[in-house]
């Protein structure tokens, strides 16, 4: 018995047939096989080439749907996945993008956008941008290359350029093709040029603006620079008149006749509009006059000798120490004279003090000393409330004033202080008079 091969064991692409010599696929199997091959080869995307013009706004959208099929397990036809995807962009061989190229992605569930205005220095040089997509759910990565071939533009740069500040837009909203097209259409109706191009778009945060509060659907604001081949219209020139300049200095909105053509969709801050006329700018470039490249003859070079003369630092050492020491000594002598030789002294103070004041002061001192001496020899009777249970001098225990069987009911509230053996009798003055029975 011959064992079946591996592709015949339940594979949807299994071969079927009657004989050994020829094997054929069924129509259903053929369709499934072709669909699988197409799905696999459709994941292998080749590098993309874009051809922007120098001095003209370049916008490239990194679509999440384009990269979803790069992450295994590959989705089946008709299956919708909403994995969070972020992008990292850099110039090949460098950690960051070119200076003129910016990138923005608001959330992992929104598309990323590369935008900027190519410079004339990069014309004819292919700029390869590495785009790395990260699936934040499965941690899978996919990498593609974007080849930017910058072409030279006609009439570059455009001679008349105007920069508008739109308050009710974010940069990713303004980069949408339909929104940018509506704005250029409104500018074209006001300016009436033959040729009009968007030159650059910059977020207000990149110009030092503040992050808006998350209330009332406030926007960051965006600066949009456009260029044309005809002079500015009278409506755009209205910003430069003195009345509107005064209103702008007072933080009031200027009066612009063509503002209603923008107001339906774009809120423009006319005080921040900038009009640049390239035809009136004076070139500051100065041609460099190159010389012959021969230096003037300075004679023969004489290097310093190898043997250096020894230098005596003893004098410098003495000067360094002597000068501060002398200054310190002079200051010390002056301070000593002031503190010791200029003191008045007690005798001089007494000579200048009146005699009556000295006598009064001496009397006060004598009285104070006498009171202090008398206070040391005081022996008066202590109050009963402060008498201790023992003798304060000998330390003997004092018997109580009354025995335990003493009738305290007849005791008066105010007792006369009895003289104890250790107390000194205080003489009392006796009044003379008659005693009545």
From Swiss-Prot:
PTM comment, free text: N-glycosylated.
Membrane side Cytoplasmic: residue ranges: 339-437
Pfam families from the UniProt entry: Sarcoglycan_2, Sarcoglycan_2_C
InterPro entries, per database record: Cadg, Sarcoglycan_alpha/epsilon, Sarcoglycan_C, Sarcoglycan_N
Alphabetized SMART domains for the sequence: CADG
Glycosylated residues in this chain: 200
Record keywords, A-Z: Cell membrane, Cell projection, Cytoplasm, Cytoskeleton, Glycoprotein, Golgi apparatus, Membrane, Transmembrane, Transmembrane helix, Ubl conjugation
Transmembrane segments: 318-338
Keyword Cell membrane among UniProt keywords: yes
Topology in the lipid bilayer: Single-pass membrane protein
Extracellular side, ranges: 1-317
Subcellular compartments: Cell membrane, Sarcolemma; Cytoplasm, Cytoskeleton; Cell projection, Dendrite; Golgi apparatus
Family, as annotated: Belongs to the sarcoglycan alpha/epsilon family.
Purpose: Component of the sarcoglycan complex, a subcomplex of the dystrophin-glycoprotein complex which forms a link between the F-actin cytoskeleton and the extracellular matrix.
Protein name as catalogued: Epsilon-sarcoglycan
Species per Swiss-Prot/TrEMBL record: Macaca fascicularis
